[in-house]
Swiss-Prot record:
Role played: The BSP-A proteins from seminal plasma exhibit both simulatory and inhibitory actions on the release of pituitary gonadotropins. The exact function of these proteins is not known.
Database matches in SMART domains: FN2
Disulfide linkage: C54-C78, C68-C91, C99-C125, C113-C140
Record-annotated Fibronectin type-II domain positions: 49-93, 94-140
Primary location recorded for the protein, binned into one broad class: secreted
Protein name as annotated: Seminal plasma protein A3
GO cellular component, one term: cell surface
Subcellular localization, as worded in the UniProt entry: Secreted
Keywords on record: Disulfide bond, Fertilization, Repeat, Secreted, Signal
GO BP of this protein: phospholipid efflux; positive regulation of sperm capacitation; single fertilization; sperm capacitation
Family from the record: Belongs to the seminal plasma protein family.
Organism the protein comes from: Bos taurus (Bovine)
Domain of life: Eukaryota
Secretion signal, residue range per the UniProt entry: 1-25
Amino acid sequence: MALRLGLFLIWAGVSMFLQLDPVNGDEQLSEDNVILPKEKKDPASGAETKDNKCVFPFIYGNKKYFDCTLHGSLFLWCSLDADYTGRWKYCTKNDYAKCVFPFIYEGKSYDTCIIIGSTFMNYWCSLSSNYDEDGVWKYC
């Protein structure tokens, strides 16, 4: 067996070996020459599903989530059911919670993003129909 020249990388607790070139020159690269990390299964070891859409809000561990969460994971994820049953997926840029219109803020209804109440004078919106009750928001 020829000595293998390569890089051993460690990033975020995941290690992998990437072979640079076969040392003896006649050996071809194959999947056997690369050690890949095991499949990630974070949120309470449920099954990751990629085809479905995130459901917001969802309840996980007696807490209501209005957007993707890091709870129990190194990566943002969401539930595929309103009450988490083990079906989940990692969030992509298209999965994050959307603004809810109209929403109530300080007893008044708004149909667009607002700057009122913003410390940094940026437009924001509520992630629920009633900001006064839930207090969840994001910048627009």
